[in-house]
Regions:
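Short beta-strand-to-loop elements that line the ligand-binding cleft
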Residues: 70-80, 90-93, 163-174
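Bilobed "Venus flytrap"/periplasmic-binding protein-like clamshell domains
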Residues: 40-68, 126, 132-198, 269
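Pocket-flanking alpha-helical
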Residues: 60-63, 77-109, 121-130, 176-180, ...
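C-terminal motif of bacterial Sec signal peptides marking the signal peptidase cleavage site
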Residues: 18-19
């Protein structure tokens, strides 16, 4: 029983440890340097800062910044990380769990500059689960993570999937999870905002607190207290090299805009269409989130604790490539 319990309560926080989902691009990327140079040359010539948005909260904040009078920011919503991996950006807001993978794939050519959202992790089920035996026959609905996370999930589930007839379904988009929830039973689903709020509207799902789940892991080395890092700002070193003042200005403006979002603000139609929610719902959900702005030494300390949590779940998760202090941008 203890073995089942340990596996169950490890996979709950693990499957969605970092919060908001962004799927990993599955297409093979070219290694032809000449082709990469040509692609860069085709980018339009502009003095505007190229910002990529990969999370819900950043979509709303950057929408506000993009409407500023000086038109300094060129904001693009992205659905995969291919442009980040090829360094085709100046600044980006991405899910925290992608940072180490991106750092290694870009040969260390990014820096982490700020933590902007915490605790965007939500676990729901249509049934109460009081002990591991009640996991039997359940379907776990999970947004697809990156390769290292997916391998970690499989290794933790192991033989229990077959023995307890647990079915794990990975989804390219949380939109698909929402659709399937409507006609599914005996499920556990992992969601981030705004999909979590959409799922629980008019539905009586049981909700699980991630920290409480972690505290139930027998002999766990992972601390059950503290916040989970969800959204972060990263910067391209090539841009940062000659634009430190400009980047510092962006960080200050992002922080200010984050605190200025209020009821009555009118969002761009693209956001409303993409998330299939009303303007009022979008603002309300944003305001309910744990929006924060942590930078410099405090950010580095918080993120190191986050990386420690991952390593305590699996000591080989970074395959010996855990970033050094060079990862952090400190003003």
């Amino acid at each position: 029983m203890n073995r089942f319990k340990k596996v169950f309560f490890i996979i709950l926080p693990l499957l969605f440890l970092s919060g908001c989902f962004l799927s990993k691009n599955k297409e093979e990327k070219t290694k032809d340097t000449q082709k990469e140079v040509i692609e860069v040359e085709k980018r339009p010539i502009t003095n505007r800062i190229d910002i990529k948005s990969a999370t819900y909260a950043s979509d709303i904040i950057l929408d506000k910044l993009s409407k500023s009078e000086d038109k300094a920011y060129e904001v693009t919503k992205i659905n995969n990380l291919s442009q980040i991996e090829s360094l085709n950006f100046d600044i980006a807001v991405v899910p925290a769990y992608q940072v180490v993978d991106l750092y290694n794939k870009t040969n260390g050519n990014i820096k982490l500059a700020a933590i902007t959202v915490l605790n965007n992790i939500h676990i729901i089920s249509d049934k109460q689960i009081n002990n591991p035996t009640e996991m039997a026959g359940k379907t776990i609905m999970v947004p697809e993570l990156n390769e290292s996370m997916n391998k970690l999930i499989d290794s933790k589930l192991g033989f229990v999937k077959t023995l307890m007839k647990i079915n794990t379904e990975f989804y390219y988009s949380q939109k698909d999870i929402i659709k399937n929830l409507e006609n599914s039973e005996n499920i556990i689903a992992f969601l981030s905002e705004p999909y979590y709020s959409k799922a629980i509207t008019n539905n009586n799902y049981y909700r699980f607190d991630v920290n409480e789940v972690i505290s139930m892991i027998p002999n766990s080395k992972t601390e059950s207290e503290g916040d989970f890092v969800s959204d972060v700002i990263i910067v391209n070193k090539n841009y940062l090299r000659d634009n430190k003042d400009s980047f510092d200005k962006f960080l200050a403006e992002y922080k200010n805009a984050q605190g200025e979002i209020k009821e009555g603000d009118v969002l761009s139609q693209g956001i409303i269409n993409n998330y299939d929610i009303t303007n009022e719902e979008a603002i309300s959900i944003f305001k309910s989130m744990d929006n924060s702005f942590i930078d410099s030494d405090t950010m580095a300390g918080v993120f190191e604790i986050y990386l420690d949590k991952l390593e305590n779940l699996d000591k080989n998760i970074f395959s010996g490539n855990r970033p050094s202090d060079d990862l952090y941008y400190k003003r």
